[in-house]
Curated annotation (Swiss-Prot):
Its cofactor is Ni(2+). The gene is mvhA. Its EC number is 1.12.99.-. It comes from Methanothermobacter thermautotrophicus (strain ATCC 29096 / DSM 1053 / JCM 10044 / NBRC 100330 / Delta H). Part of a complex that provides reducing equivalents for heterodisulfide reductase. This is F420-non-reducing hydrogenase subunit A. Ni(2+) binds at C61, C64, C442, C445. Belongs to the [NiFe]/[NiFeSe] hydrogenase large subunit family. It is an enzyme of class 1 (oxidoreductase). GO terms for molecular function: ferredoxin hydrogenase activity; nickel cation binding. Transmembrane segments: none annotated. Keywords: Metal-binding, Nickel, Oxidoreductase. Gene3D superfamilies: Cytochrome-c3 Hydrogenase, chain B (1.10.645.10).
Length: 472
């Protein structure tokens, strides 16, 4: 047995490593994605007042903090007896604007800083990074920074702060927009529509030039899951829709019923669990949540996003029910445009209505909140007692749900490229990393750090006795 190790996986949010196990003939026997980080936020929440949850859980992550805040807020709403449609309309719309702003920030970060170097900065490991893009194409870098800055202003105004928002309250929201601020945010959202279109104009030809790689690298067939509202793409509210491997409707369920459909498998080498559809078992029930999944399960984009709808229509005509892993990047940019259009449309409307309920009554029991985080479906489930204290918390993040698919994807790359007699180098491992990057996994949170020395990428080769043979 020979073991190949790549540590860390680069240009992702967090720290992971890949190990490839070869038999004595040099054939791939097994491929594993190891996640070494551990969080205990569910335990942190126990004993805390339920209304504190939306202020605590954003610290799980500095990138998808808004979605943790909103999923928690929706779970808290339920514990106070509010259905999503009971939230005051102006507050509901403010929460949506916060969500769209966070999406633009996250999707912009992923494409320009994490994914684009694989397609723009060349194949040399030393230049395959955002710094090379800044050097070779400073205009593109400035475009990325402007897009993300505008997006964070939307989050700041609606969430109370640009990172780790605090504004959502039971059944409402605490922030207000004066006329001047709303007009300024509208201009920023409209500018982001232009920047999102420019990003698609830049990216689509690159994807088309690499279509052979798109159609071959790490592709697997799975079920896909995402929120829809009356069949329309939605990232804040709706029902959960699952489609099977052929794109047929498999199931739709209300967020509160998620535990009836989803189960988790455990493997000893990773802190992450391996979710699957309970009725189908593991691994037959492996599913994905992602920008691509959301496009796959939706019938159309919102009426407020006509430009994104045109891109969605073209994407569907070209790829149908898409399973190609690298198409995540394309789908992500269609969503980037949709979020900018939806935010601009909302900011043109009236946001001056009441944003806080007249009365609140805490209820003992369970509350479940589901939103679509940039990486996929996010669930917060809290149980509270008669005093309003949390007795149990369960948080199911997108990356956990994509964990089985990521591992299956890198296994396929290893089997396709690692053969007896073929020297395994950085280029092959980068292809595995490209598969993982497509999912945009979020493995770390804002309260954890990695020693800087661990950021140096190494490729290690061990012999059948477990001795180190070579380090690259």
């Amino acid at each position: 047995m020979v073991k190949l190790t790549m540590e860390p996986v680069t240009r992702i949010e967090g720290h992971a490593k890949i190990t490839v196990h070869l038999d004595d003939a040099g054939n791939v026997e097994d491929t594993r994605l190891h996640v070494m980080e551990f969080r205990g936020f569910e335990k942190f929440l126990q004993g805390r007042p339920i209304e504190e949850a939306p202020r605590i859980v954003p610290r799980i992550c500095g990138i998808c903090d808004v979605q943790h805040h909103l999923a928690a807020a929706k779970a808290v709403d339920a514990c106070f007896g509010f259905e999503p449609e009971d939230v005051l309309p102006a507050a509901y719309k403010m929460r949506e604007i916060m969500n769209w702003g966070s999406y633009m920030h996250s999707h912009g970060l992923h494409f320009y800083f994490l994914a684009a170097p694989d397609f723009i900065a060349g194949k040399d490991r030393k230049t395959r990074n955002v710094f090379q893009i800044i050097k070779d194409a400073p205009d593109i870098a400035l475009q990325a920074i402007e897009l993300r800055k505008n997006a964070l202003e939307l989050v700041r105004a609606t969430g109370g702060r640009p990172i780790h928002p605090t504004s959502s309250t039971p059944g409402g929201i605490s922030t207000e927009l004066d006329d001047e601020t709303q007009k300024d945010l509208l201009k920023k959202a409209q500018r982001n529509v232009e920047l999102a279109e420019a990003t698609l104009e830049l990216a689509v030809p690159i994807f088309e030039e690499n279509i052979d790689l798109v159609n071959s690298l790490g592709n697997i067939e799975t079920y896909h899951t995402g929120l829809v509202k009356d069949g329309v793409w939605d990232v804040y509210d709706g029902i959960v829709r699952i489609k099977d491997k052929e794109g047929n409707m498999f199931r739709e369920f209300k967020p509160a019923d998620y535990a009836d459909t989803i189960a988790e498998h455990v493997k000893p080498y990773s802190w992450l669990k391996f979710p699957y559809i309970k009725d189908l078992g593991y691994p037959d029930g492996v599913y994905r949540v992602s920008p691509l999944s959301r496009l796959n399960v939706a019938d159309k984009m919102p009426d407020a996003a006509p430009k994104a709808q045109e891109h969605f229509k073209e994407f569907r005509e070209n790829f149908g029910y898409a399973q190609q892993t690298l198409l995540y990047h394309w789908a992500r940019l269609i969503e980037l445009l949709a979020c900018a259009e939806c935010a601009a449309d909302a900011l043109e409307g009236d946001l001056s209505g009441e944003k806080f309920p007249d009365s609140l009554e805490r209820q003992a029991g369970d509350g479940v909140g589901i939103v679509e985080a940039p990486r996929g479906t996010l669930t917060h489930h809290y149980t509270c007692d008669e005093n309003g204290l949390i007795t149990k918390a369960n948080i199911v993040v997108a990356t956990i749900q994509n964990n089985p698919a990521m591992e299956m994807g890198i296994q396929k790359v290893a089997q396709d490229y690692i053969k007896p007699g073929v020297e395994v180098d950085d280029k092959i491992f980068n292809l595995m990393e490209m598969v993982i990057r497509a999912y945009d996994p979020c493995l770390s949170c804002a309260t954890h750090t990695i020693d800087s020395q661990m950021r140096l990428a190494t490729l290690e080769v061990y012999d059948s006795e477990g001795d180190l043979v070579k380090r690259i």
